[in-house]
Amino acid sequence: MKDFYYETTYILRADLTEEQVEQAIAKYQTPLTEAGAEVQDTQHRGKRRLAYLINKQREGIYVQINYTGDGSQIAPLERALRLSEEVLRFLTVKQEVRPPAPVAVEA
């Protein structure tokens, strides 16, 4: 079966502590790895102001996960995100081509 490249971005409530955010990131990687996906990269994008109120929240913590899989891994992840009260919104997109690997920049 052919693997495709996916990117899931989700927004966590801004009132979570850094420890709770790290636990949430680990919690949402688990359904992916259990279903056979290979997590390529996880980026904690930080706290940002939302364009409009979502569940009475003005700010959210953005997290992005890039992973490969055959597509069957998306449903368990999105189910976990949908049922969680700490997640405000999420979006999964299928990438057409593999994103380039991040290049280290020398200072």
UniProtKB/Swiss-Prot annotation:
Organism taxonomic ancestry: Bacteria, Bacillati, Cyanobacteriota, Cyanophyceae, Synechococcales
One GO cellular component, as annotated: ribosome
Protein name: Small ribosomal subunit protein bS6
Any single Pfam family the record assigns to this protein: Ribosomal_S6
Domain of life: Bacteria
Protein family per UniProt: Belongs to the bacterial ribosomal protein bS6 family.
Flavoprotein recorded as keyword: no
Molecular function terms from GO: small ribosomal subunit rRNA binding; structural constituent of ribosome
Function summary: Binds together with bS18 to 16S ribosomal RNA.
Gene from which the chain derives: rpsF
